[in-house]
Each structure stands twice: as structure tokens, then as C-alpha cells.
Regions:
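Small-residue-rich segments of transmembrane alpha-helices in multi-pass membrane proteins
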Residues: 82-95, 175-179, 253-264
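Select transmembrane alpha-helical segments in multipass membrane proteins
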Residues: 10-28, 58-59, 120-140, 177-180, ...
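Helix-loop junctions at the membrane interface of multi-pass solute transporters
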Residues: 2-3, 26, 65-66, 137-160, ...
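Flexible loop linkers connecting adjacent transmembrane helices
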Residues: 1-12, 192-211, 240-246
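Membrane-interface loop-to-helix entry segments
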Residues: 18, 22, 26, 39-45, ...
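Extracellular/periplasmic helix-exit of transmembrane alpha-helices
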Residues: 94-110, 124, 154-157, 169-200
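Helix-loop-helix module between adjacent transmembrane segments
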Residues: 2-67, 221-232, 248-251, 266
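A generic transmembrane alpha-helix motif of multi-pass inner-membrane proteins
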Residues: 252-281
Length: 281
């Protein structure tokens, strides 16, 4: 990506402003995402197993350190985790939908009424929904945050068109499929049961209604795989940006990995609202 912009500007050996800004912005963005990841994992394990966030955070950081400090381990772990977690989550959601088919019309009615209703429009509800959708959409896929080209640039394929189609499919799977699965799980639970809840507590309470304690544990395990694979992925992206800015040497590469682990630790023990507000910024 950086080389493309340098060639575009006719300066192959000099760093141009746009490529430098891209690299810096990416690193800042990924630091925020690291905190959101660990915070979600610790919250889910607290709800499922009543484990204090500090203990979960320490274990998470240790596991991450063992993996990221080993050369070429990132992609190998991702190749194993991502397909398994996506399929399992999708299958469980289909089971919940099929066991609650009678409630589906009411779910879709509620979605459209609360998003586009007259009361919501007058009260500014549509703008709030749109704003939250944009902010959370940045975390559901990478097209909005601008980091998707990092994955496309590293892909090995015989045509850029194929790479583009794969990236488009990734947005569809992440946002339309996976996020819709989460929405169905929560909306198919009784409204009075989840009233006033948010974050992991909301999702796991809804899953407990559908599948009992197994559902709560399943969400914790699945979220761990989702979050951990995302963390490893952003480290893979950050590696190229760090190498571009500071050189591909042991000091710079180790430094950014240590910083990522520190952010992972801070996010795990920080308050939910603080982490998400920082991530939104």
C-alpha cells in the first residue's frame, strides 16, 4: 500500500505524506481495538465463570505473548481459529432461530419500527441508530476503518479482481451474517429479561435464556476465539506499518508487539465505558 502511493507520487524512495499518515493512523486505531478485544473477553468470562477480570487478563496476555513473539505463528493460528468459530456461531444461531420461528415476524417488525418509526425520527432516534451503526460497524469489519487493504495487499492471488471479491465477501460475512446472528440471539429473548443490560451481559443473558448455562459458556469461548484472532490479525497488519515507519528490525518489531500486549492488559482491567469511548475516538 505504501509503495503504491510512493509510485503514484513519483517518489519511490521517499516516504510521502499520505502513506505515512496511513501507517500512523493504522497503529493508533489498532491500539484502541486491542483494548476493546480484551475488555470483551474479560467481561464474558466474568459472566460465565465469575472469574475476576484481572485473572483473565493476565492469562490472555500470557497466551498472546507466547504466540506473537514466535515468528510466523500469527497466520497459522488464524487459519485454524477463524473458520471454526464462524461456523459454530452460525450453526448455534440457526438452531435458535428455528426453535423460535414464530417470533421472527415480531423481531423484524421491531427492528424497522424502532429504526424508522415516526417517534424515533422526531426524537432523533434515527440519527442515534445511524451513528451507533457506523461506530460499531468499524469494529465488525475493516472496510470502514480503512485497514482492509492490509489484508488484500498480503494475499497471494493471480488477479486483483479476485482479491477485491474476497474483501467484499469478508464485509458481508462479518456484518450481515455474524452481526445479524448476534442481533437475532438478543432480539429473540424476552424484552423484560434483557431490559437495561448492555455489552456482554446482554448477549450472555439472552443466550442463557435460549440454551441455559451452555449458551453462556459457548459465548465466552466463541468470543475468546473471535477476539483473539482479531488481535493476532491486527498485529500482522501493524508489522508492515511499523517496518515502513521505523525499519524492519528486531527493536521496532519487538517494541510494537510489547506495546500491543500492554494495551491488551489495560483494556482487560479498564471500565467498559472507558474502553469503548476510547475505541470510538
Amino acid at each position: 500500500i505504501h509503495r503504491y502511493w510512493e509510485e503514484k507520487q513519483g517518489r519511490k524512495r521517499k516516504k510521502v505524506l499520505l502513506s505515512v499518515l496511513f501507517a500512523i493512523s493504522g497503529l493508533i486505531c489498532w491500539c484502541g481495538i486491542s483494548q476493546v478485544i480484551s475488555n470483551s473477553v474479560t467481561a464474558s468470562f466474568k459472566n460465565a465463570f465469575d472469574i475476576p477480570p484481572m485473572y483473565t487478563t493476565i492469562v490472555l496476555v500470557v497466551i498472546a505473548a507466547v504466540i506473537v513473539l514466535r515468528k510466523n505463528a500469527t497466520v497459522k493460528v488464524l487459519d485454524l481459529l477463524v473458520p471454526v468459530m464462524a461456523v459454530l456461531y452460525f450453526v448455534i444461531t440457526l438452531f435458535i432461530i428455528f426453535t423460535n420461528l414464530g417470533s421472527m415476524p415480531g423481531v423484524f417488525k421491531r427492528i424497522f419500527e424502532e429504526a424508522f418509526g415516526f417517534r424515533q425520527a422526531v426524537a432523533g432516534g434515527f440519527g442515534v441508530v445511524l451513528m451507533n451503526g457506523v461506530k460499531r460497524g468499524l469494529f465488525s469489519n475493516e472496510a470502514g476503518s480503512g485497514s482492509a487493504p492490509c489484508a488484500a495487499a498480503a494475499a497471494e492471488c493471480d488477479s486483483p479482481v479476485k482479491a477485491g471479491f474476497v474483501q467484499a465477501l469478508g464485509v458481508f460475512v462479518d456484518t450481515i451474517v455474524i452481526c445479524s446472528c448476534t442481533a437475532m440471539i438478543m432480539l429473540l429473548a424476552p424484552e423484560d429479561l434483557v431490559q437495561g443490560l448492555s455489552g456482554m451481559e446482554l448477549l450472555q443473558t439472552a443466550m442463557h435464556y435460549h440454551m441455559g448455562q451452555f449458551g453462556v459458556i459457548f459465548i465466552a469461548a466463541t468470543l475468546f476465539m473471535f477476539s483473539f484472532s482479531t488481535f493476532l490479525g491486527i498485529l500482522f497488519y501493524a508489522r508492515g506499518n511499523v517496518a515502513y515507519l521505523f525499519g524492519d528490525n528486531w527493536g521496532s518489531q519487538t517494541g510494537y508487539k510489547v506495546l500491543a500486549l500492554v494495551m491488551l492488559f489495560i483494556g482487560g482491567i479498564a471500565a467498559y465505558t472507558f474502553v469503548w469511548d476510547l475505541g470510538d475516538v
